């Protein structure tokens, strides 16, 4: 190899996510993608005890609460902590849905979630990388 040859920089393929995620996505789908991406980066905490500790430390960026939680004191505590510490709070209709997003399930060979365990509350401490879905969630939070 002579010194006159230039070394070619490796070609990085464009991120496939930009082509997959439409700009007019609804907030629920955007929240699901945001939770899954945060989980991949280790930024999701599940359960009342861990969520309350993270909110108290003011390390939480977003709290997601299931509407069908059957413990009124649980809901009251999470809402009060989020209000006291200025943490944004979103709700989802089902604890099973939130549990699936949080990874509390088994994935079968076809990619479908099986044996989903309900999750009443989760807190995101690290969003990971900036995505279109995250921007949609942030716009929704800012508008409310």
Curated annotation (Swiss-Prot):
A single BP term in Gene Ontology: translation
Modified residues (N-acetylserine): 2
Statement: the UniProt record of this protein carries the keyword Ribonucleoprotein: yes
Keyword Ribosomal protein tagged: yes
Pfam family, one: Ribosomal_L7Ae
GO CC entries: cytosolic ribosome; cytosolic small ribosomal subunit; nucleus; peroxisome
Highest taxon in the source lineage: Eukaryota
Protein name: Small ribosomal subunit protein eS12y
Keywords carried by this UniProt record: Acetylation, Ribonucleoprotein, Ribosomal protein
Family statement drawn from the similarity comment of this UniProt entry: Belongs to the eukaryotic ribosomal protein eS12 family.
GO MF annotation: an example: structural constituent of ribosome
């Amino acid at each position: 190899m002579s010194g006159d040859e230039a070394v070619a920089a490796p070609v990085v393929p464009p991120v496939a996510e930009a082509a997959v995620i439409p700009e007019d996505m609804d907030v629920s789908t955007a929240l699901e993608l945001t939770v899954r991406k945060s989980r991949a980066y280790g930024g999701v905490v599940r359960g009342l005890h861990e969520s309350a500790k993270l909110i108290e430390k003011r390390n939480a960026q977003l709290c997601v609460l299931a509407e069908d939680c059957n413990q009124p004191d649980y809901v009251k505590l999470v809402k009060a902590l989020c209000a006291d510490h200025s943490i944004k709070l979103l709700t989802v209709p089902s604890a099973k849905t939130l549990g699936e997003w949080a990874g509390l399930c088994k994935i079968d060979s076809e990619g479908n979630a099986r044996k989903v365990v309900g999750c009443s509350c989760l807190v995101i401490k690290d969003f990971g990388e900036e995505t279109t879905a995250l921007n949609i969630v942030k716009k929704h939070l800012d508008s409310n």
